[in-house]
Amino acid sequence: MGNVLAASSPPAGPPPPPTPSLVGLPPPPPSPPGFTLPPLGGGLGTGSNAGRGSERTPGAAASGAAASSNDGNCGCLPNPGTFEECHRKCKELFPVQMEGVKLTVNKGLSNRFQVTHTVALGTIGESNYHFGVTYVGTKQLSPTEAFPVLVGDMDNSGSLNAQVIHQLSPGLRSKMAIQTQQSKFVNWQVDGEYRGSDFTAAVTLGNPDVLVGSGILVAHYLQSITPCLALGGELVYHRRPGEKGTVMSLAGKYTLNNWLATVTLGQAGMHATYYHKASDQLQVGVEFEASTRMQDTSASFGYQLDLPKANFLFKGSVNSNWIVGATLEKKLPPLPLTLSLCAFLNHRKNKFLCGFGLTIG
């Protein structure tokens, strides 16, 4: 979707340096103490689900399973979540590549306001500095969720990523995001999401330009068919001078207490994931992707080992391209420090990348 969004912008001089797509902006800095930042993909937290059914997720506790059973007895179906979150549970198990040295300092100025300083030094990519701000509003929906949420991130070159998320009503959530590259305005989008008791519908409008006649419109819909099965689709319409097109995808998600299987099939290809919670400490995932445009397929296996008593989190992965990766996070109590180590090895290209990170606060 991010490639389509970039393609919808009219050409204007040389392209700016590569930047993340607007739909997938870099993750915001951690939320202030005592609050949980809502998913930027539009998913609603448990605090805003009161009276509208609860989302079915694998690995739920016994009380959650009992609640789901009660919903079935009274004829109610659970909310299926959002279309963008279909593959998220599996993809979160895979390690994220980090190269060089990264230092992050989180400073909570109050219960609602936090700033973040990040310095990254790399041997391959450019070294940079990021300043992030997170503000959580006073509209309290639950002990861990409040609105509006304002998130901003600016680097040393002046490039800005900013998002505003607000809960307009118990079922309606909106988001606005902008992205600049130095002094140039790159992307902006507006999202609206409505979550009912057994369905979720969302619309995204990106980079609309009435004068040039360009823009992109994305519509998502996901419906619970049974307590375990949800079906839905995505429709993407993009237009710019001399070009327009529509891309459609269908999705299916099957959820049980400790595993989740999801498949997305469309004109661009196929994407399938399987997530399994083996225990409270071990989670595994398998991902398969096939692209009709690139004429390429890939398969990946990832796992996450979490030992809370040891303050230890490990993620590992291997894929069909013979790329092996791993990350390790170790908290160092009583100090507010988190140590991160990362290593990736590409056997085919004989390349090795490693990274070291330290988070304070």
Swiss-Prot record:
Transmembrane segments: none annotated. Residues 40-50 have a biased composition (Gly residues). One of its GO terms (cellular component) is mitochondria-associated endoplasmic reticulum membrane contact site. GO terms for biological process: positive regulation of apoptotic process; protein import into mitochondrial matrix; protein insertion into mitochondrial membrane; protein targeting to mitochondrion. It is a multi-pass membrane protein. Gene3D superfamilies: Porin (2.40.160.10). Residues 1-10, 59-69 have a biased composition (Low complexity). Residues 1-72 are annotated as: Disordered. Keywords: Ion transport, Membrane, Mitochondrion, Mitochondrion outer membrane, Porin, Protein transport, Transmembrane, Transmembrane beta strand, Transport. CDD domains: Porin3_Tom40. GO terms for molecular function: monoatomic cation channel activity; porin activity; preprotein binding; protein transmembrane transporter activity. The keyword Protein transport applies. It is found in: Mitochondrion outer membrane. The keyword Methyltransferase does not apply. Residues 11-36 have a biased composition (Pro residues). InterPro entries: Porin_dom_sf, Porin_Euk/Tom40, Tom40. Channel-forming protein essential for import of protein precursors into mitochondria. Plays a role in the assembly of the mitochondrial membrane respiratory chain NADH dehydrogenase (Complex I) by forming a complex with BCAP31 and mediating the translocation of Complex I components from the cytosol to the mitochondria. Belongs to the Tom40 family. Forms part of the preprotein translocase complex of the outer mitochondrial membrane (TOM complex) which consists of at least 7 different proteins (TOMM5, TOMM6, TOMM7, TOMM20, TOMM22, TOMM40 and TOMM70). Interacts with mitochondrial targeting sequences. Interacts with TIMM29; linking the TIM22 complex to the TOM complex. Forms a complex with BCAP31 (via C-terminus) which mediates the translocation of components of the mitochondrial membrane respiratory chain NADH dehydrogenase (Complex I) from the cytosol to the mitochondria. This is Mitochondrial import receptor subunit TOM40 homolog. It comes from Rattus norvegicus. The gene is Tomm40.
